[in-house]
């Protein structure tokens, strides 16, 4: 039940985040293709020197997202949510909020976890040594029990019935 409740809370939170982002997003004027290419060339020329022309030509074909907005991907509770066109300021604010959120306290025995297999192994070794000692000291437990307390022989005198043989009656 707890897993179903947390997944519905997650879906509600993601829905609210998406709605918030849509409301806060400012409408941008449409940009023509020629203006976008001219701006991209100006930015590229200002940032890099064309030292390797073949490599620079290959880099021209790569589409880069606009500097103002980009898709935001959130991984949480085994789910992935992608929100398109998130401004950099909002992404930074979300990262700050996620960093300041309280995380579950770490257990105090977390440092002892690597030592547990060694402790188990030592415990198992002690148990096996004791078991081996018990087996070697009492290799035949039934014979020793019979030798330790010998039962007196029973001699029952049973009269044989004439129709049946008496061999099986001599216990």
Curated annotation (Swiss-Prot):
Keyword Plastid part of the UniProt annotation: no
Motif (Jas): 117-142
Domain Tify intervals: 65-100
Cell compartments where the protein resides: Nucleus
Post-translational modification: Ubiquitinated. Increase in jasmonoyl isoleucine (JA-Ile) levels mediates its degradation via COI1A-mediated proteasome pathway.
A Pfam family it matches: tify
Alphabetically ordered keywords of this record: Jasmonic acid signaling pathway, Nucleus, Stress response, Transcription, Transcription regulation, Ubl conjugation
GO cellular component: nucleus
Predominant cellular place of this UniProt entry's protein: nucleus
Matching InterPro entries: CCT_CS, TIFY/JAZ, Tify_dom
Superkingdom: Eukaryota
The keyword Nucleus is assigned to this record: yes
Nuclear localization signal (motif): residue ranges: 119-126
Gene Ontology BP annotations: regulation of defense response; regulation of jasmonic acid mediated signaling pathway; response to wounding
Protein family membership: Belongs to the TIFY/JAZ family.
Domain notes: The jas domain (117-142) is required for interaction with COI1.
PANTHER family hit by this protein: PROTEIN TIFY 11D, PROTEIN TIFY 4A-RELATED-RELATED
Self-association state and partner proteins as the record states: Interacts with BHLH148 and COI1A. Interacts with COI1A, COI1B and COI2 in a coronatine-dependent manner. Coronatine is an analog of jasmonoyl isoleucine (JA-Ile).
Biological function: Repressor of jasmonate (JA) responses. May act on an initial response of JA-regulated gene expression toward drought tolerance as part of a BHLH148-TIFY11D/JAZ12-COI1A complex.
Protein name: Protein TIFY 11d
Organism expressing this protein natively: Oryza sativa subsp. indica (Rice)
